[in-house]
UniProtKB/Swiss-Prot annotation:
Organism of derivation: Synechococcus sp. (strain CC9902)
HAMAP family: DNA_ligase_A
Keywords annotated in UniProt: DNA damage, DNA repair, DNA replication, Ligase, Magnesium, Manganese, Metal-binding, NAD, Zinc
Binding annotation for Zn(2+): C409, C412, C427, C432
Cofactor: Mg(2+); Mn(2+)
SUPFAM superfamilies (UniProt xref): BRCT domain (SSF52113), DNA ligase/mRNA capping enzyme, catalytic domain (SSF56091), Nucleic acid-binding proteins (SSF50249), RuvA domain 2-like (SSF47781)
Active site: K117
Gene Ontology CC terms: cytosol
A GO molecular-function annotation: DNA ligase (NAD+) activity
Enzyme Commission designation: 6.5.1.2
EC top class, as a word: ligase
Protein name per its UniProtKB record: DNA ligase
Length: 680
């Protein structure tokens, strides 16, 4: 058993190593819950024995130093992190410390504000005469990285304050984050391009903000909530609640899930509610931030070296669970990437039963030293994706054997290859049935051709029975053949044939995305097809003038090289010709969203918010969303007072009822199509 001095040294080393990996390398090595527990242990050791406190202790600073590659800037006002409370006793102890700091009797009432703690990355935004002048990361709390060019790409951050008489100088603090649905789309695109997946939204956000190319940041669609306001003293609002109102009036998004609290009981009720309800939110939250409402009293309370005395983060309990690893299976993606997946005894996490989690790649398996039969600790990263966070080797049975990935593709028997610096292992056999199935699933997916009724099970039947050997073969199927397959009746077969016919009308951007070219996602496909009106002009540029492609906003060299390689492959040229023989043009047409957008010199739906509900006669939900956004409109997932139009199809449901109650205008598909075509 180490003595206190040895334990303090051990904790400092562990925490400093983890902080360096998180803040400087952007490669977290320790989950938050473990870091928080170890930090709390070190803090208590130093408080009980002050001689153990050293200058390099993580309790004496906020985080890691700025990384190389960006300019280091000094914060005008320190951007400190918050102390944590892990239970009600911790919260009560903080409240007593706060009362002593402002010289109030214990038990005195205090007005407090409770706000959700967004699981993202803190930013400091400086405005000069209402115009965004500088944006910086937290860094070590005193100095951060200047990332203004990246932050300008975040739509939720105004470049100019929406104020008639903006102050000469103001600084706003807030949290950049990636919403859950956006995170899922980013990982889906990365998977489609054969790239490693992000572990959770916060890590994805941190890595995005530190990209040297702002085009990459723009493509990942970060969001932002503002929560702190710093004005010259004479202009500062009287309270935190008023400051939040000021921020809303200035054009910032402020989290609506907040409350004025008269005592700790109010705070605990707020925290208890959101601990359960957080799973319904479109973003990750890991606790509640409690702040003293009166800003004059905040100044009186002041700061410790590390954090403000007038605020604390009340953390939700970390959702982790132990389980036993049963087996590791491999999945083969449409690009041939082999993804190992852990299968374990079911555990309950974040309101759902979980029994599988991706292991990402062979390096991750080696890092975990994973053995079959191991007791593993599982959590939902960002409350979304199950992941294996660690192994408990002390519980390893004597019969446990190391996990070994196969050397040959389990589908076709070809050698598996790991090229260059890639972490991914691939099957490089283009005729591999698993790659074909993945390519077909991608082609018919909602973001691509959106073929209703053609799911994974049916695709497996078609490939396994040799009925489909390429994408083009889908369009040679007939209703009689489909009707003879398992679980396919005459009606289902006829519906699928109609859906395949309808897919020929999808936009040029969707067709390009559906081809599954390495590195091309939905966003980049739209950008490319806005510049090149057909596949022939795109192929010519890809093979002879790649600089025309890299000149497109958001398109880099890797993507241009992927296009060149794809179009140079005779098999892919044959596929295009085969699909053209089945009615595909691979070009803009009069109803294409790209042409609709080009026809309107101004985005004539800009500033309007739409909500889609029910089934439309001809447009899929994703296609209607795409066309509205091309014309400048915004599509929201829920009805509110800010909604301008509800587009309602069959079986519209509760959204239609709510919209009618709020007096929101209702559109059918015909009226929507008319709005899309009408330009000012």
């Amino acid at each position: 058993m180490p003595d206190q001095s040895e334990r303090a040294t051990e904790l400092r080393n562990l925490l400093n190593t983890a902080a360096h990996a998180y803040y400087v390398l952007d490669t977290p090595t320790m989950e938050d819950a473990v870091y928080d527990r170890l930090y709390q242990e070190l803090l208590e050791l130093e408080q009980n024995t002050p001689s153990l406190k050293t200058a390099d202790s993580p309790t004496q600073r906020v985080g890691g130093a700025p990384a190389e590659g960006f300019t280091s800037v000094e914060h005008r006002i320190g951007l400190l992190s918050l102390d944590n409370a892990f239970n009600r006793d911790d919260l009560s102890a903080w409240n007593e410390r706060l009362l002593r700091a402002i010289d109030r009797p214990l038990g005195s009432p205090l007005d407090l504000v409770s706000e959700l703690k967004i699981d993202g990355n803190a930013l400091a935004l400086s405005y000069r005469n209402g115009v965004l002048e500088r944006a910086a990361t937290r860094g070590d709390g005193q100095r951060g990285e200047e990332i203004t060019a990246n932050v300008r790409t975040i739509s939720a951050i105004p470049l100019r304050l929406r104020l008639d008489n903006p102050p000469e100088w103001v600084e706003i603090r807030g949290e950049a984050f990636i919403p859950d649905n956006t995170f899922a789309e980013i990982n889906a695109e990365r998977e489609s391009r054969g790239e490693a997946l992000f572990a959770n939204p916060r890590n994805a956000c941190a890595g995005t903000l530190r990209q040297l190319d702002p085009k990459v940041v723009a493509a990942r669609r970060l969001d932002f909530f503002a929560y702190t306001l710093h004005l010259p003293t004479q202009e500062q609002p009287a309270s935190q609640w008023d400051a939040l109102t000021w921020l809303e009036n200035a054009g910032f998004r402020v989290n609506p899930n907040r409350a004025l609290c008269a005592d700790l009981a109010d705070i605990n009720r707020f925290s208890d509610h959101w601990e359960q309800a957080r799973h319904d939110l479109p973003y990750a939250t890991d606790g509640v931030v409690v702040k003293l409402n009166n800003l004059v009293l905040q100044d009186e309370a002041g700061f410790t070296q590390k954090s403000p005395r007038w605020a604390i983060a009340l953390k939700f309990p970390a959702e982790e669970a132990p389980s036993r690893l049963l087996r590791v299976v491999v999945q083969i993606g449409r690009t041939g990437v082999i993804t190992p997946v852990a299968e374990f005894e079911p555990v309950a996490l974040a309101g759902t039963s979980v029994s599988r989690a991706t292991l990402h790649n062979a390096d991750r398996i080696a890092e975990l030293d994973l053995h079959l039969g191991d007791t593993i600790v599982v959590r939902k990263a960002g409350e979304i994706i199950p992941e294996v966070v660690r192994v408990l080797p002390e519980l390893r049975p004597s019969s446990a054997t190391p996990v070994q990935l196969p050397e040959h593709c389990p589908e076709c028997g070809s050698n598996l290859v790991r090229e260059g610096d890639e972490v991914a292992t691939r099957c490089v056999n283009s005729s591999c049935p698993a790659i074909l199935r993945g390519g077909l699933r991608h082609w018919v997916s909602k973001g691509a051709l959106d073929v209703d009724g053609l799911g994974s099970k049916l695709i497996e039947q078609l490939v396994d029975q040799g009925l489909v050997r390429s994408i083009a073969d889908l369009y040679r199927l007939d209703a009689a053949l489909l009707g003879s397959l398992d679980r396919m009746g005459e009606r289902s077969a006829n519906n699928l044939i109609e859906a395949l016919k309808l897919s020929r009308q999808r936009s040029w951007a969707r067709q390009l995305y559906g081809l599954g070219i390495h590195h091309i996602g939905e966003v980049s496909a739209k950008a490319i097809t806005a510049e090149f009106s057909d596949s022939n002009s795109l192929m010519e540029a890809a093979c002879t003038a790649p600089e025309r492609i890299t000149a497109i906003y958001g398109i880099g060299t890797e993507l241009a090289q992927s296009l060149q390689q794809w179009f140079s492959n005779p098999a892919n040229q044959h596929l295009l010709d085969d699909l053209r023989s089945q009615g595909f043009r691979f070009a803009l047409d009069d109803n294409d969203p790209g042409r609709l957008g080009a026809a309107a010199s101004e985005q004539h739906l800009k500033g309007l918010t739409f909500v889609l509900t029910g089934t439309l006669p001809t447009l899929s939900r994703s296609e209607a969303k795409e066309r509205i956004e091309t014309c400048g409109g915004k599509v929201s997932g829920s009805v509110s007072k800010k909604t301008d139009y509800l587009v309602a199809g069959e079986e519209a449901g509760s959204k239609l009822t709510k919209a009618t109650t709020l007096g929101i205008k209702i559109l059918d598909e015909d009226r929507l199509q008319a709005m899309l075509k009408d330009s000012p």
